[in-house]
Amino acid sequence: MNKPFCDWFSRPPVRRYDGIYYYDSDRDADCFDESDVAIWRSGRMKRNFHSDFFLNNPASRRLVDAIIAQGDPVVEIACGPGMGLMPSVKQLAPDHVCLATDANSLVIEEWKRYLDGNETIKNLDLAQFSLMDIPFRDNTVPAYSGYIGLSSTRNGEEGHERALREIYRTLTENGFFYTIETWMDTEAMLRVFRESGMTPWSGLESDHPTPTWRERFLQVGFEIVSEDVFESRTLTADDNELGEAAEQLGIGISVISKAYILQKN
């Protein structure tokens, strides 16, 4: 782990290996296994690392350009096997100082394996920790970035709130959070769950409307510098079982992703 990141931690890792700090956070992570690893190793990680997907969308390109223009070290949250915005930042600014993080140790280990074996990359560190328990000191991180990192947080609305408050706590005064998050039509989702007999997802409650990301960001204290539609579509069978059930019932579930530049007040 290189500077400045190694100076930001408030407590030692559970273990250190090959320059990576591990904080034993797999319980809060997406569930990946060896079948996923086989897909990643078949070329998926290489395609993800060299993808121009975010560079070709005006909303996400605005985030990437802003990260580079700001110039400060940036921490990618919940990077997953796509590594979020970091590959795009590295394509345009190879020397930019970045830390990619995820709660899943397998994701981090596989990124380390891929990068060491296939790329000549500098100023890109890796760490494992949960967004709901970020091991950084207060007011230390100048910039975070993410792609549906908050949207995929476990434990429903409670998990979203905990993760967002951790990001806000650890950002420096006037620090930035560049993120793309997804909102889904919860009323339509609940209708599909009822009519299909499927068990509703944890944290999805019919008597409490799900807040928008704008509402969540403002509640925590962020200033919304910019908000742009990244993608607007309908959930399909290719997404998951809920999308399949929705198609069979003829119910459209709106999925809207927006790109935000947020600043800590």
Q: What are the residue ranges of the model-derived segments?
A:
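Class I SAM-dependent methyltransferase SAM/SAH-binding core
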Residues: 81-133
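Short glycine-dipeptide loop
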Residues: 171-177
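Conserved alpha-helix/loop element of class I SAM-dependent methyltransferases that forms part
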Residues: 50-71, 87
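Short alpha-helix
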Residues: 204-221
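Conserved class I S-adenosyl-L-methionine
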Residues: 178-201
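N-terminal, positively charged/glycine-rich alpha-helical extensions of SAM-dependent methyltransferases
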Residues: 2-44
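A conserved beta-strand element that flanks and buttresses the S-adenosyl-L-methionine
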Residues: 145-146
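A short, conserved alpha-helix within the catalytic core of class I
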Residues: 153-166
